[in-house]
Amino acid sequence: MDIKLKDFEGPLDLLLHLVSKYEVDIYDVPIVEVIEQYLAYIATLQAMRLEVAGEYMLMASQLMLIKSRNLLPKVVESTPIEDDPEMELLSQLEEYRRFKVLSEELANQHQERAKYFSKPKQEVIFEDAILLHDKSVMDLFLTFSQMMSQKQKELSNSQTVIEKEDYRIEDMMIVIERHFNLKKKTTLQEVFADCQTKSEMITLFLAMLELIKLHQITVEQDSNFSQVILRKEEK
C-alpha cells in the first residue's frame, strides 16, 4: 500500500504549524517543546523510510543547537549577546507568518475577482479540498510522531526487544477494529498502548490511515493538545 502524506512548504511552514497550536504570540511559545515536536516529526519520517529534504535536516541541526543552549544553566551576561539564534528564528517565523497571511489574502481577493470576470476552474476547488484533507492527516501524523518518540524512550529504558519485521497492515487493521467490539470510540493512546517495537507502531499507524481512507473510522480532537479520539463509522 502506498501511503503519501502531503509535505509542508518548508521547515518554517512546519514550525509555524506547530507554534500556531499554542495560540499565543510567537515570542511567547515554549520553544523547547516546539523543537522536540519538530525533531520527533523528522525522526518518524526517517523511521518510516520517507525522504526528508535537506532543508529540514539543516533546520533540525539549528534547532538542536537552540535546544542545547536553552537547557544550559543561565549565565548573566555583562553585555547583551548580539547573535541569538533563538530570537533570529522567532523573527524569521514572525516574518514568514505575515508573508503567509498576506499571500492568503491576495489569493482570496483573486478568487473573488475571478467570480465576476471568469468562470472559476473546477481544479481550484479540488485542490482546496485536498489541502483540507491532508492537513487533518498531517495533524494526526504529528501527534503520532510525538507518541512514537515517547514510546522509544520507554522501550530504551526497558529490556531489549527483538524487532519483528513481518507486521502486516491487514493484521493491524483487525487489531484496531477489535477496540470497537464493545464500544464506538477509543483513544489514540489506547490503540498504541501495547506496542513493543518501532516497526509495530509504524505498521499500526499505516493501518489506521487505511481505515480512515476506507471511511471505517474517523478521527476527532476537541482542541489542540487534547486526546485524539478514534470513532467507528456508522454504517
Curated annotation (Swiss-Prot):
<comment type="subunit">
    <text>Component of a cohesin-like complex composed of ScpA, ScpB and the Smc homodimer, in which ScpA and ScpB bind to the head domain of Smc. The presence of the three proteins is required for the association of the complex with DNA.</text>
</comment>
<dbReference type="GO" id="GO:0005737">
    <property type="term" value="C:cytoplasm"/>
</dbReference>
<keyword id="KW-0132">Cell division</keyword>
<keyword id="KW-0963">Cytoplasm</keyword>
<comment type="similarity">
    <text>Belongs to the ScpA family.</text>
</comment>
<dbReference type="Pfam" id="PF02616">
    <property type="entry name" value="SMC_ScpA"/>
</dbReference>
<protein>
    <recommendedName>
        <fullName>Segregation and condensation protein A</fullName>
    </recommendedName>
</protein>
<comment type="function">
    <text>Participates in chromosomal partition during cell division. May act via the formation of a condensin-like complex containing Smc and ScpB that pull DNA away from mid-cell into both cell halves.</text>
</comment>
<dbReference type="InterPro" id="IPR003768">
    <property type="entry name" value="ScpA"/>
</dbReference>
<dbReference type="GO" id="GO:0007059">
    <property type="term" value="P:chromosome segregation"/>
</dbReference>
<keyword id="KW-0131">Cell cycle</keyword>
<dbReference type="GO" id="GO:0051301">
    <property type="term" value="P:cell division"/>
</dbReference>
<dbReference type="GO" id="GO:0006260">
    <property type="term" value="P:DNA replication"/>
</dbReference>
<keyword id="KW-0159">Chromosome partition</keyword>
